[in-house]
Amino acid sequence: MQPTFVLVHGAFANSFSFAPLQAELGLLGHRSVAVDLPGHGFQATFTRAYQSPQDPEGLATAPGSIKGITLADNVAHLIGILERAKRNGPVILVGHSRGGITITAAANARPDLIDRIVYVSAWCPVRLDVNDYYAEPEMAGVDPAAFASALVGNPAELGLLRVNFRTAKPDSLAAFKEAFFADGTDEQFLTFLNTFQPDENLDVGGSADRAQPATWGRVPKTYVRLVDDAGLPLALQDRLIREGNELTPDNPYDVRTLAGSHLKWLVDPAPAARALGELATLPAPSARA
């Protein structure tokens, strides 16, 4: 039976970023659904202060619809989509970047709805909370200035993270490009940057949201490594794979590797679409034993 790929975006992103990938999947004969987590997509806040000419003071204080949204809200929303998708047959759940936190928590809660879980350079916390991984050696080369230089307002007062992706500051744009799309042209980079929304929620979960062997560990899983990713470095991706395998040695990751940066696979999606398409007929680990 044909599976449905359910695609979950990362921070500051939305379903729009999956459009090229969905086109490739569709042309290969695969069905897919791109999710907008709560407060994303057409639920996002784009204030007039964000338009040109920008109003920096207004942008720093304007309320955002994503305020108060939690990881639990994201998971509940995703589970509702998984329940609908599951009525049509097998479900392959795919998360990118911060989306990995949500798909991990969803697999902890409802493994019965997921036939395979796929991380594309995505977070899957096992031994540490996500924020704590940033202090680990694998993340030493990640420069927080990429976001800090364009951060707007006080997150504690706003109740959200706000980044001015429409900044014209050369240093900020250079930091964004280096972190996420160093192998793209300037035109591709700026186009992708304009699909981002300025606001993201604050909740990245805690120890209870780490991968749980009794539930998450039952789901066949794949990790797609992005070799040139500077935002989620390959060393950290490999550590997450290793920790996941140690947690569930009888259900190890099926590991795939793609060349390119954090965003390249979404702009040039043919290799990723082929890799994902191969998973549609991949048997579960128990069936391969």
Regions found by a protein language model. Give the residues of each.
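Conserved alpha/beta-hydrolase
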Residues: 25-61
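Alpha/beta-hydrolase fold nucleophile elbow
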Residues: 74, 86-97
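Flexible "cap/lid" loop of the alpha/beta hydrolase fold
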Residues: 108, 114, 118-163, 204
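Catalytic active-site module of serine/aspartate enzymes centered on a nucleophile-bearing elbow/loop
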Residues: 248-289
